[in-house]
Structures are given as C-alpha cells and as structure tokens.
C-alpha cells in the first residue's frame, strides 16, 4: 500500500499538541493601523483549532 501524503500547506500552519492542533490567529497581516495595540497583542497568541475542524486537519496530517 502506498504511503499517505501529508498536506504541506496544513503542515506549515498547524502543530499537533496534547490538546489538539495549535494555530495562528487571523487579521494580523495588513491594515493594522486601525487596530488597537491591545487587539494586535491578543491576536499574537496561538489558539486551538475548533473541535469540528480537528478531523479534517488530522486527515491531512496522517503522521502528526
């Protein structure tokens, strides 16, 4: 049986942890001048993928 392929885009964006998959938050790439310092600071923190999305991520990362 052939090896399962890892989705490389998903591999770069998500990291497997004991509690699920860790991801970076959106809205921190551009148009930052109108966002407050507090909002930008909070967006820097990593967060976990939603429970409903975990099976899809796990399927794309078979060796994670």
Curated annotation (Swiss-Prot):
Q: Does the keyword Zinc apply?
A: no
Q: Cite a GO CC annotation.
A: cytosolic large ribosomal subunit
User: Transmembrane ranges?
Assistant: none
One Gene Ontology biological process? translation
Q: Which UniProt keywords apply?
A: Ribonucleoprotein, Ribosomal protein
Pfam family for this entry, one? Ribosomal_L35p
> Which Gene Ontology MF annotations are present?
structural constituent of ribosome
Q: Does the keyword Cytoplasm apply?
A: no
Record-linked HAMAP family: Ribosomal_bL35
Record family assignment: Belongs to the bacterial ribosomal protein bL35 family.
Protein's UniProt name:
Large ribosomal subunit protein bL35
Species in which this protein is naturally found: Shewanella loihica (strain ATCC BAA-1088 / PV-4)
Phylogenetic placement of the source organism: Bacteria, Pseudomonadati, Pseudomonadota, Gammaproteobacteria, Alteromonadales
